[in-house]
């Protein structure tokens, strides 16, 4: 969608506000070119040294797994968990796992791919994007924990709180704003229909042992049928698929980098002209995640309040991340009318994360001094560039990229473990439903 169509499709008030804001931003850049240039370099450094290498593999992986039919097969296994707790199709589970391991907007990108493949509806895509909106785990551990706070263990604490509070906020959000409505339907694959036909045939349910073996075969056949149908609908060879995934992933990351650079300049100019003589601590966190967490880490707050506010900022994600998700969904032809729901889930995420951190940080900090020492000793060589500086500007690019990529195998294993845990929870949910529904 082009900028001209965006402005033409908006109301007159919105057009005036956007045009006025753009004009004021241009004037401020012309008046203060050096500050704008330094801010753009700061945003570019964060994007190029952290976001790009950490997110590119997950964007490519999610698209390739969708094309190969993995998401369809996974949806069969995650169906009970997603439908029971999140009121979503099982195929949405991959988007949540990718968002947790890859960071935003990888989850929204996966949700848009699922909607384009007609695995979920447009409204469900917006809800899945809200459920899969997480900060990049490498950024939380390396940048916030190691570089900003000089405590890698604090980064792991923030990561766990970030994930747990995100799931809690999603479960609360889907119940405050239900997914199902007269305009929303759950997409059922041909494998699901085949399974329903088998289950509804009384002639095939002759004995308990035969029923158990039939259910096992039907589950496997349902997964294989879903994956085969997806591969046939896609029809691309591996070479073309690889080229398409690289092109689309880089395009998404370029959009992300553009937003980060613009907001870095915007925050710097607001600091110069709006709050020149005040301490800049809180309001950058409302606009951009990375700059906001940096300003918070430099503030003279008590440790418990600092960690709680950092957890809340990670849950909110910043206005920049909301615009990134909106752009990803709109580029896929999806309506962005659910962005109010998205913002509500982000506020819930921030509130839950703040509360959990406020309750758990003191016990964690009291009994984890040995854990901090272990982390700093075993990870000192790999994290030395981060522990010695509080800003990414001026750091050796090769050292940063090496540190990020050294964590990618762990992130890949983490993705596999997340899927395993989600499948196990789905199995427990299925057993619980059958056990207590009799």
Please state what every model-predicted region is.
Residues 50-55, 155-170, 413-420:
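Alpha-helical transmembrane segments
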Residues 68-70, 242-318:
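Transmembrane helical segments that form the transport core of multi-pass membrane transport proteins
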Residues 14-27, 43-68, 220-232, 244-270:
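Core transmembrane alpha-helical segments of multi-pass membrane transporters/permeases
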Residues 18-36, 59-69, 174, 231-232, ...:
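Structural signal for alpha-helical transmembrane segments and their membrane-water exit/capping regions
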Residues 1-12, 178-247, 370-406, 431-438:
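Intrinsically disordered, low-complexity non-transmembrane regions of multi-pass membrane transporters
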Residues 129-132, 138-225, 264, 324, ...:
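Alpha-helical transmembrane segments of multi-pass small-molecule/ion transporters
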Residues 85-149, 283-299, 306-333, 344:
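Alpha-helical membrane segments and immediately flanking helix-loop junctions
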Residues 108, 121-124, 138-139, 167-168, ...:
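C-terminal transmembrane helix pair
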